Amino acid sequence: TSIIDDPTGYGRIVRDAQGRFVSITEHKNATEEERAIQEIYPSYACFDVQRLLESLAKLDRDPLSGEYYLTDVPAMMHGDGLKVEALTAVPAEDVLSINTPAQLAEVDTILRGRLQMEATT
């Protein structure tokens, strides 16, 4: 997962009171409380292949969007009693979206800074 300042558009990591993973809620399905969560799903995941295939076979369309959400699979696995962990391991700048010229400029600045740093080390 990643913690970002503006999680608009991203799936949110929902945790219980003890900080354990509960689910991933897509932005368009999120409540106001969930939209306030800054921990997001950056679309990186590791699964046991057999368990993933079993879960995909049970996956239903989201009633709001009509889409199939891969992000529903970890909650399904959790509900089936399987161990699901969500680790905060992705730097915020590695999950930035590029949908506008301003976002492109931001990512360009970050990349140029990284390239300059690599060139000097």
Where are these regions (language model features)?
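Short, intrinsically disordered, charge-balanced linker/junction segments flanking boundaries
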Residues: 115-121
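Short beta-strand-to-loop element that shapes/binds the nucleotide-sugar donor at the catalytic cleft/hinge
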Residues: 1-14
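Catalytic-core segments of class I nucleotidyltransferases/pyrophosphorylases
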Residues: 22-95, 99-113
